[in-house]
Regions:
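Catalytic-site neighborhoods of secreted/periplasmic enzymes
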Residues: 1-52, 56-77
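Active-site-proximal cap/lid insertion segments
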Residues: 44-48, 56-162
Length: 163
């Protein structure tokens, strides 16, 4: 069968040929980022080698925050301002930056909603970004703990990639 999956206007599974409904369901569960589904798979008895992919979109959800949209996997509590991280040493605009970048940002607010952020806006943004990293770390931790619990490390390679 040929299948694809469209969520919020984006393909999360491009059109492809799938020979097994079980494989299709497994792919969809993993693509949706459900660590619990991966753990459930790891807890099953396997007689053959397998390949498991776990995809997570955080901390990319920082983009929704910048556009004042709800975060798709739940909002994050905002701590008091005095607990937000500081700004990086290279925060100030570099006088040698190309003017074309600022010009492009001024033409397209929806693509660059952070253009007019204040230093405190950036500190809040950075805090949220760090919390999103912590969330995805916790999800990955569930899978790594399942590998431990099932004693699968001698036959397991974990590869982390990111864009």
């Amino acid at each position: 069968m040929i299948v694809s999956m469209l969520v919020n206007g984006m393909y999360i599974l491009p059109p492809c040929r799938i020979k097994s409904l079980v494989l299709l369901l497994s792919i969809l569960i993993v693509i949706m980022g459900w660590a619990e589904a991966c753990v459930g798979f790891l807890e099953q008895k396997h007689t053959k080698p397998f390949f498991l992919v776990a995809g997570f979109d955080n901390p990319h959800n920082i983009c929704e925050y910048a556009r004042s949209q709800n975060l798709p996997w739940g909002n994050i509590e905002d701590p008091p301002q005095n607990e937000w991280p500081g700004l990086p040493l290279n925060f100030a605009k570099n006088p040698y930056d190309a003017d074309v970048i600022s010009y492009e940002q001024s033409l397209n607010y929806s693509a660059y909603p952070t253009r007019n952020y204040t230093p405190d806006d950036w500190r809040r943004y950075r805090n949220l970004y760090y919390r999103l990293v912590e969330k995805v770390d916790a999800e990955i931790g569930k899978i790594l703990n399942a590998i431990d619990k099932q004693d699968l490390w001698k036959n397991t390679a974990v590869i982390f990639t990111s864009d």
